[in-house]
Amino acid sequence: MATAVRLLGRRVSSWRLRPLPSPLAVPQRAHSMLPVDDDINGLNEEQKQLRHTISKFVQENLAPKAQEIDQSNDFKNLREFWKQLGSLGVLGITAPVQYGGSGLGYLEHVLVMEEISRASAAVGLSYGAHSNLCINQIVRNGNEAQKEKYLPKLISGEFIGALAMSEPNAGSDVVSMRLKAEKKGDHYVLNGNKFWITNGPDADVLVVYAKTDLTAVPASRGITAFIVEKDMPGFSTSKKLDKLGMRGSNTCELVFEDCKVPAANILSQESKGVYVLMSGLDLERLVLAGGPLGIMQAVLDHTIPYLHVREAFGQKIGQFQLMQGKMADMYTRLMACRQYVYNVARACDEGHITAKDCAGVILYTAECATQVALDGIQCLGGNGYINDFPMGRFLRDAKLYEIGGGTSEVRRLVIGRAFNADFR
């Protein structure tokens, strides 16, 4: 049965998130879920229900753990939670029904990314790496045997997926990668490493880019994509990285020492990996833009109620004009970002995928999320600066989106070059 039926057929009832305890003078009611006006956002009834269903689930099962996950840099129940996401049908949200997917679009994918990130941006990032960077790449580029072998377990949550592209000296300049894949009989032998790999310590299945021709000119012609399993001989992971933000979304270095990968595990064709890579980047940037949306909404969830509980000079601080200005700035940034992201997602669902706007949505939402997080800290004053409140976590998490998946500088280059190409 299609998982879309499981996902969208649930009855949605109203709920209210239990407020997080505060150790200070602000009452516990200071945190509540703010309503999202999806009539303005242009969502249909199924999309509204999708948001409500996922929001209810993650606010009950993930949000109360978000601070602990951040502080310990560990999500102890990751595997169990992943299977719950699988049972909801959201891990393979864009995958075909025949493999257990929900067969929905990129707008729905963004909505789920947003709501998970609203509860925990770190877990939202891991979800994006699994559902888009890994699953969607196999859906778009895998052959039938690969899809039948890998997709069902990735979609159910039995397996965790990742994508490995970056290296210590090949981040934005990804085609300069040095991970080498040499063909020997019916296998390829991989030697080298990958770095900053989201889900790396946990992944069972990884989409890995390697050089099958180190002398190719241009260098992009020598790249091949492989599907690598964690138990393949010669593959290992280094210790988990201790990051500024997105803590609990596990990241590490991957090590390939004479790692044997069957030739049957080539994703697409030999030396055609750059096409897999570049076509996937546009949709990666779009889906990941849901992360900053969720962070901004979480900031508002904590900030707006706080401003109407905290008192100074004999009145609620939300009554001061400067604080009203902060509220207006945060809200309008979020709403402008939502409209841009949702409209680009709709266009992609209709087959109109543009690198310029996929880069644009992650550029704009990432930088707005950082500013909204800073504004939220300012609104809470001293409480915003201590770790009893989550405001610092929002800022640290938001900053990742200006760096990961292509930096803000690279996104500006993508947009600028697109305009220049129109005038050649």
Curated annotation (Swiss-Prot):
Pathway: Amino-acid degradation; L-leucine degradation; (S)-3-hydroxy-3-methylglutaryl-CoA from 3-isovaleryl-CoA: step 1/3. It comes from Rattus norvegicus (Rat). This is Isovaleryl-CoA dehydrogenase, mitochondrial. FAD binds at residues 163-172, 196-198, 310, 321, 378-382, 407-409. GO terms for biological process: branched-chain amino acid catabolic process; fatty acid beta-oxidation using acyl-CoA dehydrogenase; L-leucine catabolic process; L-leucine metabolic process. The gene is Ivd. The modification N6-succinyllysine is found at K56, K65, K76, K260, K316. Its cofactor is FAD. The keyword Transit peptide applies. It is an enzyme of class 1 (oxidoreductase). The keyword Protease does not apply.
